[in-house]
């Protein structure tokens, strides 16, 4: 299963990057960060401290509906609405791990 991640540069995002790297059944296919983030273009494995992987951090505005089978959201309450709007528009299943809602 191809898994996409909203908030790859956060604490839990980095944990999920590492967990997906160890998974036999799920692979990280896209990792998003804010459009103005300094992490855009950075390799997600290097960001998570696990070495270079096949995925670079992508600006949210560059996300395609074909990039993943499911998205996981570990962002902030202030941006979750826009992420959910994107998921609804693209008929993308989403798992929400964001706290403080």
What does each model-identified segment do?
Residues 30, 69-70:
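Short, Asp-centered acidic motifs that coordinate Mg2+ and/or phosphate
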Residues 6-9, 13-18:
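N-terminal Rossmann NAD(P)H-binding glycine-rich loop of SDR-like oxidoreductase domains
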Residues 71, 76, 82-101:
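ADP-ribose/adenylate-binding Rossmann-like module
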